[in-house]
């Protein structure tokens, strides 16, 4: 059509005085514009689908990241809690571990008892030894003191003999023993003692008889008392004689005839 045409589209828009080509273009544009709702709806659908897919991706990424964070935090917590657990376990193991068995405890107790017993025995033995040593020392000292106190050495001289001698009066118990001792010292001097003459010396010692006390001999025994007076041996009891004698002398009878008178 060469004239003006009126075209009414579905949208109600009117186009006047357009040529045919323009009319076709207008028809196409009208068709395109006749379905704006469908294009919009498709676009919205695409957008909605894209958004939903994006949201799902975001949610999945968020969930994966959160799960990874949760795992990491759990790993860190487990790693942090493992030293504490290990320390607690170490403490629990260190205290009272390994346990002592009954036989070991008994052996330790018996060993301690044996050591204590040995120590007590050794200390007791040491105490007894010390005590015995002290007692022995005391006894030795007592014997030494007793011997030093009780030994009563008295000098004895004889007329005509230059060398004097000493006799222990406490070793004797009577005048007869003193007489025999002086007789052996001055009158019956044995030869040097050997195996051959030992028996002879014993025989002389046992069988020798003296008459120094009865006055029938050439010599008599006198003593000097604490006052310096000379007296005849045998005129007083033996114990009194021991308490007063200071010196002994064997005199000739002719010289000592007036002694003690």
From Swiss-Prot:
One of its GO terms (cellular component) is nucleus. A motif (EAR-like (transcriptional repression)) lies at residues 45-49. Residues 1-43, 62-90 are annotated as: Disordered. Its main location: nucleus. Keywords: Auxin signaling pathway, Nucleus, Repressor, Transcription, Transcription regulation. It is found in: Nucleus. GO terms for molecular function: DNA-binding transcription factor activity; identical protein binding; transcription cis-regulatory region binding. GO terms for biological process: auxin-activated signaling pathway; response to auxin. Induction: By auxin. SUPFAM superfamilies: CAD & PB1 domains (SSF54277). Preferentially expressed in vegetative organs. The N-terminal half of the protein contains two conserved domains I and II. Domain I includes a slightly degenerated ERF-associated amphiphilic repression (EAR) motif which seems to be involved in the activity of transcriptional repression. Domain II is required for the correct degradation of the protein through the SCF-mediated ubiquitin-proteasome pathway. Interactions between Aux/IAA proteins and auxin response factors (ARFs) occur through their C-terminal dimerization domains III and IV. PANTHER family: AUXIN-RESPONSIVE PROTEIN IAA10, AUXIN-RESPONSIVE PROTEIN IAA17. Aux/IAA proteins are short-lived transcriptional factors that function as repressors of early auxin response genes at low auxin concentrations. Repression is thought to result from the interaction with auxin response factors (ARFs), proteins that bind to the auxin-responsive promoter element (AuxRE). Formation of heterodimers with ARF proteins may alter their ability to modulate early auxin response genes expression. Belongs to the Aux/IAA family. Homodimers and heterodimers. This is Auxin-responsive protein IAA10. It comes from Arabidopsis thaliana (Mouse-ear cress). The lineage of its organism: Eukaryota, Viridiplantae, Streptophyta, Embryophyta, Tracheophyta. The gene is IAA10.
């Amino acid at each position: 059509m060469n004239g003006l045409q009126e075209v009414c589209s579905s949208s109600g828009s009117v186009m006047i005085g357009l040529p045919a080509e323009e009319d076709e273009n207008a028809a196409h544009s009208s068709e395109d514009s006749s379905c704006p709702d469908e294009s919009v709806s498709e676009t919205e659908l695409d957008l909605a689908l894209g958004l939903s897919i994006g949201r799902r991706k975001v949610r999945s990424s968020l969930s994966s990241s959160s799960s990874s964070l949760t795992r990491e935090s759990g790993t860190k917590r487990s790693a942090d809690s493992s030293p504490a657990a290990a320390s607690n376990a170490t403490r629990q193991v260190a205290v009272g571990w390994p346990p002592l068995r009954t036989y070991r405890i008994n052996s330790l107790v018996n060993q301690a008892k044996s050591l204590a017993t040995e120590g007590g025995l050794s200390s007791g033995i040491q105490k007894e030894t010390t005590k015995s040593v002290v007692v022995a020392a005391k006894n030795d000292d007592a014997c030494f003191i007793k011997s030093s106190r009780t030994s009563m050495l008295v000098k004895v001289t004889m007329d005509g003999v230059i060398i004097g001698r000493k006799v222990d009066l406490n070793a004797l118990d009577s005048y007869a023993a003193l007489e025999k001792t002086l007789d052996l010292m001055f009158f019956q001097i044995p030869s040097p003692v050997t195996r051959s003459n030992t028996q002879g010396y014993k025989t002389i010692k046992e069988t020798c008889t003296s008459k120094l006390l009865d006055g029938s001999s050439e010599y008599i025994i006198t003593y000097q008392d604490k006052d310096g007076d000379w007296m005849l041996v045998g005129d007083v009891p033996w114990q009194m004689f021991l308490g007063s004698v200071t010196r002994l002398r064997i005199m000739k009878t002719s010289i000592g005839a007036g002694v003690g008178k």
